[in-house]
């Protein structure tokens, strides 16, 4: 009976659509989370006491905002941000609204990941660039970000996997994807096979993200032939 029900879902492309929607929401959210989180992380590093342009006031305010959003459990934050989604999109339902709430939940997390990666760059590298007369922008763009690239890529893997887990939570807010399939067609209908298939598919997606991210990271950390 369970197998027949699962095959019916498969034949109706419900499982396949859930995979696509999960991947779509994960990567679109990751993209915009980094559009917001990357500059925010750079500013946090720059204004830190050991940064290029220390500014305690700016760093304290931004740090408080980031920590405030990071301290709220993801599902509660997503519920709280529904009005913001409605303000931006005119609706509080659907994947568009869910993606907005996901971005707001993920961006502060990304900002801290970026800041942590930038702090791993040796101070001597920055000092050498300053001694050569580079401007702060040149140091950030041509020295800091390239030096931190392997760590940034590693952090992006963790961030993307975390955002993937958020998409499953989004099913409770009306979002689609494998989370919705697991809840509606699995849990609510006592179809454990459907739930476990969704779990396995999410695991596969995570592994693919990890493999791709690790491969890209190795390309930047492996010594060149000239070395």
Where would I find each of the regions flagged by the language model?
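Hydrophobic alpha-helical transmembrane segments of polytopic membrane proteins
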Residues: 178-215
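Short, strongly hydrophobic alpha-helical membrane anchors
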Residues: 1-17
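Short helix-to-coil transition segments within interhelical loops
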Residues: 118-148, 188
């Amino acid at each position: 009976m369970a197998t027949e029900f699962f095959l019916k879902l498969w034949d109706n492309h419900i499982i396949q659509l859930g995979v696509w929607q999960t991947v779509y929401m994960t990567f679109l959210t990751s993209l915009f989370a980094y559009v917001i989180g990357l500059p925010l992380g750079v500013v946090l590093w720059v204004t830190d006491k050991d940064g290029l342009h220390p500014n305690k006031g700016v760093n304290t305010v931004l740090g408080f905002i980031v920590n405030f959003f990071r301290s709220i459990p993801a599902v509660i934050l997503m519920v709280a941000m529904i009005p913001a989604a409605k303000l931006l999109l005119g609706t509080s339902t659907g994947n568009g609204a869910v993606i907005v709430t996901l971005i707001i939940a993920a961006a502060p997390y990304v900002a801290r990941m970026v800041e942590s990666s930038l702090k791993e760059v040796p101070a001597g590298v920055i000092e050498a660039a300053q001694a050569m007369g580079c401007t702060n922008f040149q140091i950030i763009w041509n020295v800091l970000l390239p030096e931190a690239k392997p760590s940034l890529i590693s952090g992006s893997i963790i961030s993307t996997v975390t955002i993937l887990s958020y998409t499953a939570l989004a099913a409770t807010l009306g979002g689609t994807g494998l989370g919705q399939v697991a809840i509606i067609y699995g849990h609510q209908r006592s179809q454990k096979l459907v739930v476990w298939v969704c779990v396995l598919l999410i695991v596969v997606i995570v592994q693919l993200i990890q493999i791709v991210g690790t491969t890209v990271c190795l390309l930047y950390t492996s010594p060149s032939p000239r070395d």
